Design a protein with these regions (language model features):
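Mid-core helix/loop region of P-loop NTP-binding domains shared across ATPases and GTPases
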Residues: 153-210, 218-236
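Amphipathic alpha-helical interface elements
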Residues: 404, 409, 423-500
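P-loop NTPase Walker A phosphate-binding motif
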Residues: 100-132
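Charged, structured surface patches that assemble and position nucleic-acid processing machinery
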Residues: 4-63
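Conserved adenine-nucleotide phosphate-binding loops and their immediately adjacent elements
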Residues: 57-82, 86, 262-265, 431
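The catalytic "switch" region of P-loop NTPases
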Residues: 193, 214-306, 320-324, 328-348
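Winged-helix-like regulatory helical subdomains adjacent to P-loop NTPase cores
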Residues: 75-84, 289-300, 305-391, 395
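Conserved NTP-binding/hydrolysis module of P-loop NTPases
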Residues: 128, 140-165
Length: 500
């Protein structure tokens, strides 16, 4: 569809094909990002002069689609909101021969940003290579093998016919020199333009977080980036690189394993900000309107506050409302409806927070611990940490997980996140009251008892097989055995057992 269209999210299609409605439905089902198409046949148009057919068809198409339920990265512009300024800035950095880093939590939209950058570069007739470092095909390669991979990807992108010997020249001693020679050959063989190399999931090939030992605990990171950095310093017009990940530690730390970090402070760092109130209104209002849902500015403000401006959480909340009130369209979401939906939706939040914070807790436990300190109101310890580690506070602020209040105190950005962390770390607080200590002891005892029962059950079955129940009964006073004999061994060791 032409870019000059007034309405870019939907279109009317009139066809001679009598099964056009079914064909359009198949296309929409196969591509969730497909624009909304309202199909009619010529016969329908000629035979129906009243508006009933059109009203019915529009309702059927619009109200059946859940435009909020995108869980995969967005590959098209149709439903891409709130990030265009960042995309333009990153492309501008590349056009100025500057490197960049894009960082954010899981489900914050990093991969959608990459796709948007690729689309914009395509429009500008510029080239881009994307390497997914999460793939074993990337992170299992040694540094010199990955250099070879970059050359192959670059040659393929440029559709260059230049002859390059890739078989024998990419070992530890010769890879850096071969890389420079081959990249220059390819660059000079076609139209000369600066290519953007994007390294997605950069943590997978970084020290301490790498998915393979040679990246995590070896010097492959050092040698790989020494090569790319050295080439760039000699030939700044050939390529720039953009690193995409969760945490910019690979750029911020000056040394790794006693050696200088080749890309230390070499990239401008960009965090994916949470949506502003106006961006929430734009996204929710636009998509809701197409689905027959009216979200007023007051409801958008509540969504912004309750979800902390996180676009993924906002979309999932709106999707939940859509599915809850699916049979009522058009439908205005008022405060009472919203509050009811939010209360029901909160049970889904734990899995989303688990997913979003998993990388933080696994790879950057200090930042995660600081979140827990705030949730448990252990402000004194948090402030001590913050004083000694200001970069960690900056990361949490940039992720949109914490805010600095007017009196310079730090608080969690989402009430729901605070509740989640409190429940998950209920007894991690150091200064427990006597009542909290007793509750903690009771909970731990109950958990331990359940584990011991399972251990005993498995041990008896392993040792005695079908005779396990009989062996268990032998340990019980004779006057109680007959009463318990009718119970299975599972029942005897269950939570509701009559054994105790």
């Amino acid at each position: 569809m032409p870019k000059s269209r007034v309405e870019n999210l939907c279109a009317i299609l009139i066809s001679k094909n009598s099964s056009v409605e079914e064909q359009v439905k198949k296309i929409s089902n196969s591509d969730p990002e497909q624009k909304i198409i309202i199909p009619f046949t010529y016969d329908e148009i000629h035979k129906n002069l009243n508006s009933e057919l059109y009203d019915s068809r529009f309702r059927k198409v619009f109200y059946s689609r859940d435009l909020f339920a995108f869980k995969s990265p967005l590959k098209k512009d149709s439903y891409f909101f709130g990030r265009n300024n960042l995309v333009n800035e990153l492309v501008s950095k590349h056009n100025s021969s500057e490197h960049a880093g894009v960082f954010g939590l899981r489900k914050s939209g990093k991969t959608s940003i990459i796709y948007a950058i690729q689309r914009k570069l395509n429009i500008e007739k510029k080239s881009c290579v994307m390497l997914d470092c999460e793939s074993p095909a990337i992170h299992q390669k040694r540094w010199y093998e990955l250099l070879k991979e970059v050359v192959q990807e670059y040659k393929s992108l440029k559709i260059s016919n230049v002859r390059i010997d890739l078989d024998s020249r990419y070992d530890e001693k010769n890879a850096a020199k071969s890389f420079e020679e081959d990249i220059l050959k390819i660059y000079n063989s076609k139209k000369k333009e600066t290519t953007l190399f994007i390294f997605d999931e950069i943590e997978r090939i970084s020290p301490f977080t790498g998915s393979s030992q040679h990246w995590s605990n070896g010097t492959d990171f050092i040698y790989f980036w020494q090569t790319l950095r050295s080439f760039y310093q000699k030939h700044p017009s050939v390529y720039t690189y953009m690193l995409v990940g969760t945490n910019p530690k690979c750029i911020e730390q000056p040394q790794f394993f006693g050696q200088d970090n080749p890309i230390y402070l070499s990239c401008s760092i960009h965090y994916l900000p949470n949506f502003s109130a106006n961006q929430v209104i734009e996204m929710v209002g636009t998509l809701g309107r197409l689905m027959g849902l009216n979200f007023g500015t007051d409801i958008c403000a509540l969504l912004h506050n309750d979800c902390g401006g996180h676009p993924f959480l906002i979309r999932q909340m709106c999707s939940f409302i859509h599915n809850t009130y699916k049979n009522e369209r058009p439908f205005t979401v008022d405060k009472a409806t919203y509050r009811t939906a939010l209360a029901d939706y909160k049970s889904n939040l734990q899995q989303y927070f688990d997913m979003m914070l998993n990388v933080l807790s696994s790879w950057y436990p200090d930042e995660y611990e600081m979140l827990i300190m705030l949730a448990l109101e252990d402000i004194e310890t948090f402030n001590e940490f913050a004083k000694d580690n200001p970069s960690m506070v900056d990361h949490l602020l940039s992720f949109g997980l914490i805010q600095k209040s007017y009196n310079h105190k730090y608080v969690l950005s989402l009430d729901s996140l605070e509740i989640y962390l409190k429940n998950k770390n209920k007894f991690k607080k150091i200064t427990l009251s006597d009542e909290e200590k007793l509750e903690e002891i009771s909970l731990r005892r109950n958990r331990l008892e359940k584990k011991l029962r399972n251990l005993i059950l498995n041990g008896l079955r392993f040792a005695y097989g079908k005779k396990a129940q009989e062996e268990l009964l032998k340990a019980i006073p004779e006057d109680r055995r007959e009463k318990l004999r009718s119970s299975s061994i599972n029942d005897l060791l269950s939570n509701n057992t009559q054994l105790f």
